Amino acid sequence: MKKSALLLLVVAAAFAQSGYHQLKKISIPGNGFWDYLTVDPATDRVFVSHGTEVDVVDGKKGEVIGKITGMKLIHGIALAPEFNRGFISDGGANQVVIFDLKTLAKTGEVPAGTNPDCIIYDRATKRVFAFNGRSASATAVDAEKGTLAGTVTLEGKPEFAAADGKGHVYVNIEDKSEVMQIDSKALMVLNKWPLAPCEEPSGMAMDTKTRRIFSGCDNKMMSVMNADTGKVVATVPIGEGVDATWFDPGTKYVLDSCGQDGVLTVIHEDSPDKYSVVENVMTQKGARTMALNTKTHDVFLSVAEVEILPPAEGQPKGRPRRRIQPGTFGLLEFGR
């Protein structure tokens, strides 16, 4: 092979890589299980669900700087910086917990449905939406007043959601393999659209400029949907075990954290209807949830070493039990 041709291949291979690599591992004390996490880009703080508490991590220093405790089973955290408030979905207590973003002190609770899971903030209506996994509904909270704004009845089990900033919230319905479009002011379902061939969607993100919704699905693919028509315009292969999907408007990357394979699938939005897999970055098995700092473009993934135990005594057909190996929980930070 000629040197010039070889050089072109090397250059092409370099450009085909996202640049994402592990920057550090941040240890977090405690052996509770985890779910969603989120980042405040203005402060570089990472809010991590961890059993009965939220661990607050300084993303720059890589250390825990605070905790929000006294809850039962935390799923997610949403931030409304304009009101200096954060909101926690406590699935064990069936409520949304409100806290002060600066002091981290809890300041209130709002009753929700059964097992509030995903929680997001909709800037258009100044409302927080908590999606109740076991009562097929969404609880809307007035972020400024800290009071219940209403409830949306859904048809199926909600997973993650995204807001378009124009008065619409979209949510994955896992057991129906659908996306529901909600009027976030009127609190009513406007449309429900099939995701086929995508099955059992979990993670969701959105490019609000191109009006494209990204749904990470259980059958190792990501669906791209037109947010106005509900048409699936593309599907992209991803790793196995996805649970979180993020979109970075600065790089046009769509990111899927796939815990079963232990990879971060990096996809580039070439155009609104065309997408290409850039690479699958090795993370760690079990790293299924993540959060993106849109300012630095760094990604934080929650993970721990988990031991699989046999079903409880007397329940031979029960589910295998899981136990976190002590001292192994923390965050993996990946950057470019």
Segments and roles (model prediction):
Residues M1-S4:
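Positively charged n-region of N-terminal signal peptides that target proteins for export
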Residues F15-R336:
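Predominantly soluble domains enriched in secretory-pathway, periplasmic, or organellar proteins
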